[in-house]
Regions:
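Hydrophobic alpha-helical segments of integral membrane proteins
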Residues: 26, 30, 108, 131, ...
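Multipass alpha-helical transmembrane domains of eukaryotic endomembrane proteins
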Residues: 57-167, 176, 187-188
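Membrane-interface elements of multi-pass transporters and channels
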Residues: 31, 35, 88, 117, ...
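C-terminal transmembrane module of polytopic alpha-helical membrane proteins
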Residues: 1-12, 23, 50, 162-258
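N-terminal TM1-TM2 helical hairpin plus the immediately adjacent luminal interfacial "cap"
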Residues: 2-102
Length: 258
């Protein structure tokens, strides 16, 4: 148990909470401690001001004989690509990464209201994977059966794979569209047109200030809660600097890839 706890606490903070909630809520629903009916996001529930539904609809997934494997694949992609983004492109900038998730989640909630989508786990994970792939287009990734290709094609391979094997693809398309929306407004438009369309709200820097990663023996050390609190005195400076833009460039690394 100590090893599991140590591994879990080594996950960067935003990915850790997302990963943990994506395990806890489905398991609690499966064993009957939470009513799955109250987890789904429905338009009628929102009209009744059941405002927790967009949150539970993001973390809950119905686990059963026909969905268990897909759920595990979701957890794998969540852990792998969220962690890769948070420890590479967004390293030292947890507020910026959280804002990316909030942006993608908000776009998906709006789509879900108009399209009667009940669960958001699949498209949100795909949106994060898409952003990582766009920021690491030329990286060679490995897929099933030893196939290898550039990262920019991975979202489309997953879309085709699910369409062929599962007859689905709708959630993958939503995830790709959402990820592309964020990538366009955050990276493409400022690069091609100049000026930023979105910036991280200053309030997020108050709770998640930027920090300088500490490196020792080749491993990335994340700050403790006390060290984060000690940096909050300078959070306002970080937020004012960050509002003028960030250099989020960098190169991710696929676990299990090349």
């Amino acid at each position: 148990m100590a090893e599991i706890k140590q591994w879990f606490m080594s996950i960067p903070i935003i990915t850790r909470y997302w990963f943990g909630l994506s395990i806890a809520m489905p398991v609690l629903g499966r064993i009957g401690l939470l009513n799955p009916y109250h987890m789904f996001m429905t338009k009628d529930a929102l009209w009744r001001l059941e405002l927790w539904r967009p949150f539970t609809g993001t973390f809950y997934y119905p686990i059963g004989p026909g969905t268990g494997f897909h759920y595990l694949i979701n957890l794998y992609f969540l852990y792998q690509y969220s962690k890769n983004l948070e420890t590479n492109e967004f390293v030292g900038k947890p507020a910026d990464y959280l804002f990316m998730l909030i942006f993608n989640w908000s776009a998906l909630v709006l789509m879900a209201v108009f399209m009667n989508i009940f669960l958001l786990m699949d498209p949100l994970i795909l949106s994060v994977l898409y952003v990582w792939c766009q920021l690491n287009k030329e990286m060679i990734v490995s897929f099933w059966f030893g196939t290898r290709f550039k990262a920019q094609f991975l979202p489309w391979v997953l879309l085709g794979f699910n369409m062929i094997l599962g007859g689905g693809g709708f959630f993958e398309i939503l995830g790709i569209l959402t990820g592309h929306l964020y990538y366009y407004v955050k990276y493409v438009y400022p690069r091609d047109q100049g000026g930023e369309l979105i910036t991280t709200p200053a309030i997020l820097y108050r709770f998640l200030p930027n920090y300088t990663p500490l490196r020792s023996t080749g491993f990335l050390s994340f700050p403790t809660a006390s060290s984060i609190r000690s940096q909050r005195n300078t959070a306002s400076n970080d937020s004012s600097t960050s509002s003028s833009g960030h250099n989020w460039g960098g190169r991710g690394h696929v676990l299990g890839g090349n």
